[in-house]
């Protein structure tokens, strides 16, 4: 039997960059329809189209039993009063779980069942979040510095971004009077 070769890579805890990783960049223009204040979104895109987040992924073949891992650097910012966030997703194989480790900065994870039941878990360096099977999840930067975290997930989990792009999350995370507030999403579709 031919065994897969073990390997090690370096993670820079200051920058969130994993050596030899595949880099993906999401700009605000890549997130049309994700934020409530569409006018503020349009203005920010026209005035510079900021990078919202970067992902550095080490991926394996999509097969059962293997693991992928990735870091995300989620930049601080708001569209209107809604904090910068990742697109969010279910897993294509919805019965797959995931684990997130907060490394730097301040933020949180918004999780949701297919029926719209939602939870928000605050994250700071050292926080580990378990995402159970069947829960959609997105991370949100509620601070003023980059929020960096590491995710570990089954290589065959896949990403279903389409359901979130179409329906959204049932809750949004905004700043009101200097506080982080989780509110009902007026655009959410069951």
Curated annotation (Swiss-Prot):
EC annotation from Swiss-Prot or TrEMBL: 5.3.1.9
Please give the biological process terms from Gene Ontology that the record holds: gluconeogenesis; glycolytic process
Which InterPro entries does the UniProt record give? G6P_isomerase_archaea/bacteria (IPR016758), G6P_isomerase_prok (IPR010551), GPI/OXD (IPR051610), RmlC-like_jellyroll (IPR014710), RmlC_Cupin_sf (IPR011051)
* Essential cofactor(s): Fe cation
Protein location: Cytoplasm
**A Pfam family this chain is assigned to:** GPI
Note on cofactor: Binds 1 Fe cation per subunit.
Q: How does it assemble?
A: Homodimer.
Q: Which family does it belong to?
A: Belongs to the archaeal-type GPI family.
Protein's name according to its UniProt entry = Glucose-6-phosphate isomerase
In which organism is this protein found? Thermococcus litoralis
Q: What is the lineage of its organism?
A: Archaea, Methanobacteriati, Methanobacteriota, Thermococci, Thermococcales
